[in-house]
A protein has these predicted regions:
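Non-catalytic, mostly N-terminal accessory regions of nucleic-acid modification and defense proteins
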Residues: 1-201
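Conserved S-adenosyl-L-methionine
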Residues: 179-229, 233-235
Length: 237
């Protein structure tokens, strides 16, 4: 059963990777492959946050009998999205899309200081606002492509999303002329580290240089498979 689950997850991750890599092809040419991650990564984060927010809103509406005020309370959401900063609202903009994306992500970071401080603002705003590299038409194509799928937890659980993103990072690393080791650790190395650590239920796994969280996700998978008879809720903090 565990093997079938893993195979299903890998198939889903590969499908999502293919979808994300199509986004890379949209900006190929104006953007060198060494810089793909600087555009795809923040946009993926932004779309994911917005879609998870929508899922949480829907759940809150159901549990409250349709109370929109209740559904919009910060307590109902993992991340707060200020007015005008949701993916769909930026999608409806007709010009200066790069600046709109940067502005929305900055405001989301400000609204979530305990969880997103320094996360979204680390991405270069100059790359998004330089129309000589990416004009509004290209950014529009990128937004519309990612809008074809919902990227929330219901469609893509965290571990599957992590797997797809890791495959994408590996592709970036393989194609990059830069030092790939700065942002990608091979899955085989991550898996070996987790097996050596042998985390147990109730313990905390700490990765001070977690990057995209690949080792933390592998630790959760390890616990879920090795201790399958002990139902435990695992959290990434």
């Amino acid at each position: 059963m565990a093997k079938k689950t893993i195979n299903k997850e890998l198939t889903g991750a590969q499908d999502l990777y293919n979808f994300l890599f199509e986004a890379c092809n949209i900006i190929r040419g104006p953007v060198s492959q060494d810089n793909f991650k600087d555009y795809i990564t923040p946009l993926l984060y932004y779309k994911r946050i917005s879609d998870v927010y929508d899922e949480e809103t829907e759940e809150a509406l159901i549990s409250s009998g349709g109370d929109k005020e209740y559904a919009s309370l910060p307590e109902q959401h993992r991340f707060v999205i200020p007015d005008g900063c949701h993916w769909q609202e930026v999608r409806e903009r007709t010009e200066n899309l790069g600046a709109a994306i940067v502005g929305a992500m900055r405001q989301i970071e400000i609204a979530n200081p305990d969880t997103l401080y320094g996360v979204l603002s680390m991405f270069s705003s100059q790359k998004w606002t330089n129309k000589a590299i990416l004009n509004d038409s290209k950014i529009r194509d990128l937004i519309e492509h990612l809008s074809k799928r919902k990227l929330g937890n219901k469609d893509y659980p965290a571990d599957l999303m992590g797997d797809a993103y890791e495959i994408l990072l590996k592709k970036f690393a393989d194609d990059s002329k830069a030092q790939a080791g700065e942002f990608y650790t091979p899955r085989s190395v991550v898996r070996l580290l987790v097996h050596i650590l042998d985390p147990q239920p109730g313990e905390t796994v700490y990765d001070p240089a977690c990057g995209s969280g690949g080792m933390l996700i592998e630790a959760i998978r390890y616990l879920s498979l090795i201790h399958i008879s002990e139902p435990t809720r695992h959290s990434l903090i």
